[in-house]
Amino acid sequence: MAQVRHLLGSTPGHRGLRLRIGVDPGGCSGYTYKLALVPGAETGDVVLPQDGFDVVVHTTGVDLLRGMRVDYTETLTSSGFTFANPNAKSSCGCGSSFGSSDDPERTAADAKLPRTQVEEIMEEIRPMLRGDGGTPRSSPSSRGRSAGSAEVHLRLTGACGGCSSANATLTGVIEARLRQQLPEIGRVALVA
């Protein structure tokens, strides 16, 4: 809240500004978070009074954001708002995109491939890639439950995204580890 108050105080004409929190379809996991300073509430907004300012959320996003916590974090390499959303059934390394069981396409994929297991394995792999400045984001896309029939789509970002060794990283590290742990995975593919 302190960072929002600071932003409001340093914005010319800040009186009456509110923090709008919302979601848009898209991103690497299904939805992306939106934050904006806005002059007022609109028709269909829910207004949530905070300590010194109001948060507004349009009613269409309330169910996806209910119970979410927004924090501001600073590290040696970055700073920004972070989201802890109990409605997020999946998320990506960027921290600004999430998947929800309300997304029918994502729900179908999750039902066919154990996304939680894929994500747990990816969490073991990510520190190795982060050491090189890269971050993989996974998205199960299944075509069946039998051994070797499911697919996992990966987006390599950061240094890995532009690296000429991305395919070697994919097959030598990520695909080998995923297929070892989850025999239903037949293919791991890079996506743009």
Swiss-Prot record:
GO terms for biological process: iron-sulfur cluster assembly; nitrogen fixation. One of its GO terms (molecular function) is 4 iron, 4 sulfur cluster binding. Keywords: Nitrogen fixation. Transmembrane segments: none annotated. Residues 126-150 are annotated as: Disordered. Pfam families: Fe-S_biosyn, NifU. InterPro entries: FeS_biogenesis, FeS_cluster_insertion, FeS_cluster_insertion_CS, FSCA_dom_sf, HesB-like_dom_sf, NIF_FeS_clus_asmbl_NifU_C. Residues 135-150 have a biased composition (Low complexity). Gene3D superfamilies: Fe-S cluster assembly (FSCA), HesB-like domain. Belongs to the NifU family. May be involved in the formation or repair of [Fe-S] clusters present in iron-sulfur proteins. This is Nitrogen fixation protein NifU. The gene is nifU.
